Amino acid sequence: MSGTGSAGMARGLRVDGLPPLPKSLSGLLHSAAGGAAGGWRHLERLYAQKSRIQDELNRGGAGGGGARAAGMRTKPPNLDAALALLRKEMVGLRQLDMSLLCQLYSLYESIQEYKGACQAASSLDCTYALENGFFDDEEDFQEQGSLQDGQHHGSPRDQSPLTHLSSSDWILESI
């Protein structure tokens, strides 16, 4: 009847909304099934101790040094190893964060330099890049193109200086 008693205790310790006991703690559950009254008291103490430790971890480890020391004696290598791994991951994430921040700032500076160079330059290559790259909406680009087509019906050479001027005006207005 010891087998059914331990199964009953396993079900008795399971609380609604909580996952079942991990395999590492199920061994404690089966070893405490010796006496009915003594086993339950021992399990209650273990459960209370586990709850206190879990509460301390949730609060950030403040207070309750006695229960914390008892919990650390049971599994120090695993907890210490987990904390060391967590620290390493946090340091790595901080380094990655700083690296990405530096790259973002460098990209921002490059964009500002490019915008300044394109505003200063009067070549058609820069105008082409501005027309194709810096319009917020396709509608703005199409409206500007249809206005230019409606105003002048000459050769493409006649329209290119006007396109450059309208693009420069658009850039100056947007800044």
From Swiss-Prot:
It comes from the Eukaryota. Residues 157-169 have a biased composition (Polar residues). Residues 141-175 are annotated as: Disordered. Belongs to the FAM89 family. PANTHER family: LEUCINE REPEAT ADAPTER PROTEIN 25 (PTHR46949), PROTEIN FAM89A (PTHR46949:SF3). This is Protein FAM89A. It comes from Mus musculus (Mouse). The gene is Fam89a.
